[in-house]
């Protein structure tokens, strides 16, 4: 695991400095992925890593775990509660357009992640940093991220690392057990977990990605196909014929 940790932290340093960046900013959710990414960023940029804790109608325990992650790895951090901004935007959207119902949970949840993205980039722009994403290979494969939300980042160090390997890497890096052992959650609403929403475990998903076909293989294949657009850049219309 040390070889992987060194490879990823060195890659971060090369990618960011090679593109003119001064450091890294990462959103700290209190989960395993963001904690691992913060630890890798701290290795790459010991003096120029910033973690942002961005609660938005969130479980207070997640913010506490995010702050634990920051203190454990000595990552400078700020906490910005986006709840008021989110509610104001939600009211404006729903009151201005009746076609967007206020009880559309998916749309509402995606608005949260896009507010977080906007906040991360505000800090990155000001500091000359790059936004480092926390998505892993398992999530990317089935599109378990918000387009231009948590998917709106500059770099994805875990983009080729499955959730199973992220857990191993977390233990190697010394991520607190409380964070390693908690059920994975995007924090979109109270009690939400990744595996409940997906309908299968990360272990089965990672086995599928390794070529095994379990009882949820068809459902996984369907998600992979349906989310292809999320993994591709916006298509460009061809120039008109001369």
Feature locations, PLM:
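Catalytic nucleophile loop
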Residues: 34
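ATP/NTP-dependent adenylation/nucleotidyl-transfer catalytic domains that generate, transfer
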Residues: 1-24, 39-43, 47-50, 57-58, ...
